[in-house]
Amino acid sequence: MTPAGFFITAVFVALGIVLARYLNNQKGKYLAHVEYWVLSPDTKLPDLTETMAAVMQSPGIGPTEGLLFSDIRFKIGLILSSKNKNAEIVNRSEYRDAFELSGSAIRVQYSSESKLDSKKHLQFCVHVAGALAHQVGAVGILDMVADRLWSVTEFQEFLNRKHQATAFDDHVIVTQQDDLTFVVRGLQKVGVPDLSTLPVERDKLLLARTVIDRYAAASWDSMSPMTEPIVEYGDEFILLRAAQKPGSESARLLRRQPK
């Protein structure tokens, strides 16, 4: 091989390595993440031994869930309101009143980069958040993943009504934005990336919402992104997804051409 030929070959090999690394980085990394902020009027953590005892008395918690207290992926922390007055979430209009009444947020968090095979981590975190809220006389409970503020009464009624508190409708929120996009929040709790779609044509909004709802519900149930086409009105649709960051993807709704 001539020096020129060797050089060209080396360049192509190097480009191939770079491209392979780039494509590998573009693949979405697995992340299951649950995070609740229990908005407490106090500025310190309560006795967590009492919290654990209350959680273990719940009909929805058994020995399997109880073991998660010692799981290194589970964390409870304290965020002081006085030190986070300028945080964006504290100053959002829909949350401002609740934060003004709280001295701190008790953060209940579970994060896993290893694929999970059940929703027991979610069942556990929900009951821990409920127990803490009762223990401290909380102002509210903020679901950071689904971006939803629960009143304590509403949250306790939810737990009393559903001891197995892992249903899709209670954890995932699909919203249509002003720019004709859709946002799906909450799937990340079971290791499925949340979605932000590209703009949808106005006359296809209802169809898009139906397809996205079905995708989200099926992905939640299987704890894995749905890859099969979705059939509506005799047509097949797919969501063409692209990773943005761990736990989040952008998506475009496409009609699959008939064969």
Which residues does each PLM region occupy?
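Feature marks short, highly hydrophobic, charge-poor N-terminal signal-anchor/signal peptide-like helices
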Residues: 1-9
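Core hydrophobic alpha-helical membrane-spanning segments
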Residues: 10-17
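Transmembrane-cytosolic junction motif
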Residues: 18-33
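Short glycine-/aliphatic-rich beta-strand segments at the starts of folded cytosolic domains
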Residues: 32-40
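N-terminal low-complexity, intrinsically disordered segments
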Residues: 39-98
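Structural alpha-beta junctions
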Residues: 56-64, 127-141, 217-225
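Internal, hydrophobic cores of structured domains that mediate oligomerization or house catalytic pockets
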Residues: 74-171
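Aromatic/basic-lined ligand-recognition segments
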Residues: 96, 144-259
